[in-house]
Amino acid sequence: MTKDELFEKVKEIIVDTLSVDEDEVTLDASFTDDLDADSLELVDLTMAFESEFGVTIEDEELEKIKTVENAVNLLSEKLNIDDED
């Protein structure tokens, strides 16, 4: 999986979980400011990421996820996806 493919999968999960338009989900979109996610939705999103990708996201890591790009970067790190394809 490439980072672009990861972003597309993350986008799909965000659209399904937060019921937002796909166009709204950009790398620099803030979960709370741009996508209007509340704390419960962020927990749901985290659980969806963990389930889909088979990873564990710690509370300290969750606190650092403010944008879609933060989530993609964290997941790519956990999945050992390199930028160089």
Curated annotation (Swiss-Prot):
Domain of life (superkingdom): Bacteria
UniProt cross-references to InterPro entries, sorted A to Z: ACP, ACP-like_sf, PP-bd_ACP
Main subcellular location: cytoplasm
Record PTM O-(pantetheine 4'-phosphoryl)serine, positions in chain: 39
Membrane-crossing segments per the record: none
GO terms for biological process, alphabetical: lipid A biosynthetic process
GO molecular function, one term: acyl binding
HAMAP family: Acyl_carrier
Similarity comment: family membership: Belongs to the acyl carrier protein (ACP) family.
Purpose: Carrier of the growing fatty acid chain in fatty acid biosynthesis.
Protein name (database record): Acyl carrier protein
